[in-house]
């Protein structure tokens, strides 16, 4: 399951261990090491390499040989008749250098019409083909996201829907993408955002350590140093409920429960700016008003700006005005 000589005593360095599939009675995991120098290590389970993928752009290769036919057929044949055997030989040479057998294999898993990469394990792809399928998926029919808001269970329903729509728009336009047109679409989405119910635009999460960070939620609202935002949101709910007439109808939020939370309007920077509530139990009688501008910035504008910047554009401002570069 791991290379014992290199990693003995290093288990405390493991950042995450994620099950990525089940194979009959066996399991395969993806391990991530949070330590400089161990980022490129490989892990094996049942002789299957489960750590790291490599994405390659074959556009320059195709242009260099003036290939005018199906690009996906080109890549498949290039892999089958040239790359597959070449990579195997390279692994064999590397293994021989270290006097060991080669157990690594590099397989073609998927082809994409396009992709945007934000960083390691943070990307979105417009999948065209995926092993073991024989046929291509229609363009924009299979969007794969990893490490971004679309892949996170706590993303607000409205945000998930609109981020998917915006990313599809980017892929559809391709080289014809127009940032001005994109801003107009965002403005329309923001107008629609402002009439949504809180449940549709709130962030979902589990909450713990309420007792640790919430110092006082009865006579006044006090939080401890380093209190996470979602814990503060839960504590603020309890404070308002404790000082209301609805303690029979609604329950206090306890550690290990699932909540949703959103940003609220405040009169000063010193006031608490987040409010949470139990999943499926929005307390409309005492819930403070949503700060729609801040909530929009956090769950839609900030995530989409990361893609805008990755495409080479300046990030869009909260007022959704284009800022021209001076130089």
State the predicted function of each range.
Residues 53, 58-327:
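DNA-dependent DNA polymerase catalytic subunits
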């Amino acid at each position: 399951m791991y290379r014992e000589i290199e990693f003995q005593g290093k288990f405390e360095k493991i950042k995450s261990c994620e099950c990525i599939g089940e194979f009959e009675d066996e399991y395969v995991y993806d391990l991530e090491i949070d330590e400089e120098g161990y980022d490129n290590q490989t892990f094996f389970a049942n002789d299957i390499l489960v750590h790291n993928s490599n994405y390659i752009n074959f556009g320059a290769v195709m242009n260099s040989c003036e290939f005018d036919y199906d690009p996906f057929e080109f890549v498949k044949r290039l892999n089958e008749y040239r790359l597959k055997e070449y990579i195997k030989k390279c692994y064999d040479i590397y293994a021989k250098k270290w006097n060991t057998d080669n157990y690594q294999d590099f397989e073609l898993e998927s082809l994409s019409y396009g992709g945007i990469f934000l960083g390691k394990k943070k990307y979105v792809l417009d999948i065209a083909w995926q092993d073991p399928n024989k046929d291509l998926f229609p363009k924009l029919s299979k969007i794969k996201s990893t490490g971004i808001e679309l892949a996170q269970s706590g993303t607000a329903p409205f945000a998930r829907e609109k981020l998917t729509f915006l990313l599809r728009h980017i892929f559809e336009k391709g080289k014809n993408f127009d940032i001005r047109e994109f801003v107009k679409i965002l403005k329309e989405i923001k107008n629609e955002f402002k009439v949504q119910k809180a449940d549709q635009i709130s962030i979902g999460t589990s909450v713990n350590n309420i007792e640790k960070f919430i110092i006082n939620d009865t006579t006044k609202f006090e939080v401890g140093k380093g209190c996470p935002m979602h814990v503060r949101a839960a504590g603020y709910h309890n404070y308002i409920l404790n000082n209301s007439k609805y303690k029979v109808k609604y329950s206090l939020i306890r550690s290990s429960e699932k909540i949703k939370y959103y940003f609220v309007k405040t009169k000063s920077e010193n006031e608490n700016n987040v409010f949470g509530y139990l999943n499926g139990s929005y307390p409309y009688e005492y819930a403070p008003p949503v700060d729609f501008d801040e909530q929009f910035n956090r769950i839609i504008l900030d995530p989409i700006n990361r893609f805008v910047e990755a495409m080479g554009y300046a990030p869009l401002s909260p007022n959704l005005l284009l800022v021209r570069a001076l130089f």
